[in-house]
Amino acid sequence: MGAPKQRWTPEEEAALKAGVAKHGPGKWRTILRDSDFSALLRLRSNVDLKDKWRNLSVTAGGYGSREKARMALKKGRRVVPKLTAEPMDVDVKDMDDAHDTAIDVEPLAMAFESLPTEESPDKSVARLDDLILEAIRKLKEPSGPSKAAIAAYIEDQYWPPADFQRLLSTKLKALVNSGKLIKVNQKYRIAPSPPPSGRIGTKVSSAEGMKAENNNAKRLTKHQVIAELEKMKGMTKEEAAAFAAKAVAEAEVAIAEAEEAARVAEAAENDAEAAKAFLDAVTLSMRNRNAASMMLRAC
């Protein structure tokens, strides 16, 4: 742990800026573990990096008044994204002065100042829903992240309010009860969306349409066949080919129906044989039982 009040050197600030440019803001532990920056930042902790980067961003964005921060705190609390603006080139002495004068101001107030104050609490709650779903998607754990992992992700990416843990517990319970999340062994996963009902309806209607088409197939009598043959004598080659294709299709339908009827008849015959065998066995058993009873009575 580095000393909080120890002044930052230009080399440390340069290493911090380079680390943020390489890994992004919020990845403080990753920056400290990076061999390119670990030597220069060996006296600093992840909290030191976060505070210093916040002060650099605040100064670059024009926020430096304690009074503005206190007024922003009175307007309300909500989960807000962390500031990610690139810091401007400023004098090192000014940075140290800003660190000494603004370090005790809560970071939520800094980020809250530029946000609209008339937003309703319902919108804040809805935004917390989005943050929870975002955390689950980004963490990509097979069995789902725990509540602690979700909270750590949101705290690492955003500035949560003081009662964040209570709000998170309430919101997770509500999402589970509404069916949006699935909770198994204290871990949370996004519930799979149900398949569109249109696909099932399409398959059913398609099957019904094929069945109706088969039922409507023409069944020609002998006289109709003779009439069709007479009609074919005056046809061209194209008309005759189309007529023949139609006849083949109707024949295939008839063959399929005949095969289905044969299968049904065979199944019925097998059922009848099984029923007859069962009846014969019962009859034989009854006869043997009656014979045994008569023998006992005779004795």
UniProtKB/Swiss-Prot annotation:
Residues 124-192 form the H15 domain. Residues 1-61 form the HTH myb-type domain. Residues 238-279 form a coiled coil. Pfam families: Linker_histone (PF00538), Myb_DNA-binding (PF00249). SUPFAM superfamilies: Homeodomain-like (SSF46689), Winged helix' DNA-binding domain (SSF46785). CDD domains: SANT_TRF. SMART domains: H15, SANT. GO terms for biological process: nucleosome assembly. Expressed in leaves. It is found in: Nucleus; Chromosome; Nucleus, Nucleolus; Chromosome, Telomere. Keywords: Chromosome, Coiled coil, DNA-binding, Nucleus, Telomere, Transcription, Transcription regulation. Residues 28-57 bind DNA. InterPro entries: Histone_H1/H5_H15 (IPR005818), Homeodomain-like_sf (IPR009057), Myb_dom (IPR017930), SANT/Myb (IPR001005), SMH1-6 (IPR044597), WH-like_DNA-bd_sf (IPR036388), WH_DNA-bd_sf (IPR036390). PROSITE patterns: H15 (PS51504), HTH_MYB (PS51294). GO terms for cellular component: chromatin; chromosome, telomeric region; nucleolus; nucleosome; nucleus. Forms a homodimer and heterodimers. HTH myb-type domain confers double-stranded telomeric DNA-binding while the H15 domain is involved in non-specific DNA-protein interaction and multimerization. Belongs to the histone H1/H5 family. SMH subfamily. Binds preferentially double-stranded telomeric repeats 5'-TTTAGGG-3', but can also bind to the single G-rich and C-rich telomeric strand. This is Single myb histone 1. It comes from Zea mays (Maize).
